[in-house]
């Protein structure tokens, strides 16, 4: 059985390493995701454990699609009555590029029409559409007039960990945060500090990693749990295994701080919701006044970079303060800055030993490494 796990552009190799660690086969990174093979058990495990995957798709068909008629016929030809009942709800998402069909909303509607027509012709009843919470989420991908139809195992984005309460103005998506933590190479033994933690995505993802807490363990449910062939016994065993393999998170290992008290309070609530609130050290403090908790460790921050927060003049001065504070207060540490503004990054005034290209949504970003001696 073949699968495709999508991810943030730039995290493909990180996701591939996760899939290899899970024991899946034929792991091949691609553009924006990773192909892999396995059983339904592997698909379930992928939804439960993967930290950097946005979605886990199961391709069920691929066919030439030079026209809307070809799209309808290709989708209608599939055995949809074996994949869903007329009582189930569905939703279709479409992504298109370099094809004769150019409107994604129209393509999604055409795909939906073919599916419900096939179910009606086989059963006499049409299933309903539920765009917000469907029983079966279907992905239609059209590239260069070749259409691939996939089932979305989770049914929703895997960044929805189940612990987040009210998001702050510009939250860092959990899957991207997990990727940033992985890219730092943090050893999970020395201190991990985020001095601009916002609602806590980076410390929380670091804590889940260090405690071997499955990324999807708090998620209320996944789409595949509503499918006709769902194996409830297998899923129960996987959940029990995930619970028993969790580790105790050491105290004084992970630190989150922010100068905005509302953000820190929200981060605490998110951590409490995740069951690890007592183990993360939170503080309400300005970064320039924060003291290093040890002689060495990993610091990572996602300072505002002008797309949604702050203004250019204030941010220029702020980035200069970041560099000054690194030099004065964090000698012996490895520091990482994630930003979508390269001009601002230069204001740090330190030479980066590594630059990693990533995307935060449509924004091209850099993860910059600074070795502080």
What spans do the regions from the language model cover?
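Short amphipathic alpha-helix with an adjacent loop that forms part of the alpha/beta core around
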Residues: 81-83, 289-296
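Conserved hydrophobic/aromatic beta-strand scaffold that supports enzyme active sites
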Residues: 139, 365-369
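Conserved S-adenosyl-L-methionine
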Residues: 172-292, 308, 312-316
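Accessory substrate-recognition/RNA-binding modules or partner subunits associated with SAM-dependent
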Residues: 2-136, 153-155, 159, 166, ...
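Short SAM/SAH-binding signature in class I
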Residues: 296-302
């Amino acid at each position: 059985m073949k699968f495709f796990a999508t991810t943030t552009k730039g995290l493909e190799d990180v996701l591939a390493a996760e899939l290899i660690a899970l024991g899946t086969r034929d792991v091949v990174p691609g553009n924006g995701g990773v192909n892999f093979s396995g059983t339904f058990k592997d698909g379930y495990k992928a939804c439960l454990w993967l930290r950097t995957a946005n979605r886990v798709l199961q391709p069920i068909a691929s066919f030439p699609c030079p026209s809307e008629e070809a799209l309808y016929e290709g989708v209608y030809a599939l055995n949809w009555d074996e994949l869903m009942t007329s009582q189930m709800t569905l939703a279709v998402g479409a992504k298109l590029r370099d094809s004769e069909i150019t409107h994604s909303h129209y393509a999604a509607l055409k795909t939906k029409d073919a599916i419900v027509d096939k179910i009606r012709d086989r059963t006499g009843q049409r299933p309903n559409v539920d765009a917000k919470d469907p029983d079966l989420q279907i992905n239609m991908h059209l590239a260069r007039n070749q259409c691939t139809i996939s089932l979305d195992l989770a049914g929703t984005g895997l960044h929805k960990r189940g612990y987040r309460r009210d998001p702050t103005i510009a939250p860092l998506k959990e899957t991207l945060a997990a990727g940033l933590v992985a890219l730092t190479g943090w050893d999970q033994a020395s201190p991990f500090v985020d001095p601009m933690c916002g609602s806590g995505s980076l410390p929380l993802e670091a804590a889940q990693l260090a405690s071997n807490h499955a990324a999807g363990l708090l998620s209320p449910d996944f789409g595949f749990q509503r499918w006709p062939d769902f194996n409830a016994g297998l899923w129960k065993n996987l959940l029990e295994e995930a619970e028993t393999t969790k580790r105790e998170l050491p105290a004084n290992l992970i630190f989150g701080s922010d100068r905005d008290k509302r953000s820190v309070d929200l981060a605490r609530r998110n951590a409490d919701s995740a069951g690890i609130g007592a183990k993360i050290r939170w503080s309400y403090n300005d970064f320039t006044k924060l003291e290093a908790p040890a002689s060495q460790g990993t610091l990572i921050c996602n300072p505002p970079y002008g797309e949604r927060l702050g203004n250019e003049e204030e941010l220029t001065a702020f980035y200069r303060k970041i560099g000054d504070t690194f030099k004065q207060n964090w000698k012996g540490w490895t520091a990482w800055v994630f930003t979508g503004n390269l001009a601002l990054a230069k204001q740090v005034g330190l030479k980066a030993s590594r630059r990693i290209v990533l995307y935060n949504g449509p924004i091209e970003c850099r993860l910059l490494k600074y070795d502080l001696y």
